[in-house]
Amino acid sequence: MRRTRAIQAPQELVPSWPRVSASVRPDGTGTLTINGTERPVAAGDVMHLRSGVIARAAALAARLRRPVRLTVTEDPATWTLAVRPSGVVQLLTSEDTLPSVAGLHPHHGPCRECGEEQPVTAGTCPACGVRDPHRVDVVLGGPMITDLAASTMTRSGTSDTSDLVNGDGDVRNNA
């Protein structure tokens, strides 16, 4: 009798660059830091803020055409996540890899204007028409994080543009 062995799909390694981190506070404020550049973020509540941070990470992932690593601190806990260009959010393994995306769906969150649930990758709310329905950036005289060109996100001396989260140990709103 011949034995068959299941073939496991290789797990995807998520690079540690760019460095994306977020700090989320209970009052719906926090910070989003990309490669050392910290920007304030704010929303009406924590749920809107989480979705907005994930939306920013998904936009960065889409520009880089690969998942990005997101470290989220929501005291007292910290999670290391990966956000895919499609808006799917996953916990990273201890080896910094991601399991298959099979069966997972993009993160959804409420529009900042009308509250209608939609994928974090939505550029315009289909219900109220507002652009960037998950935007949480607080603009203080500089470009919004999403306005930064991909060229500003490269490591000096390279052209490589190779990497957000939430939860109770699991990924929230990943329905």
Protein language model annotation of sequence segments:
Residues 2-132, 175:
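Hydrophobic alpha-helical segments that drive targeting, anchoring, or assembly
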Residues 41-44, 137-175:
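Long, charge-rich boundary regions
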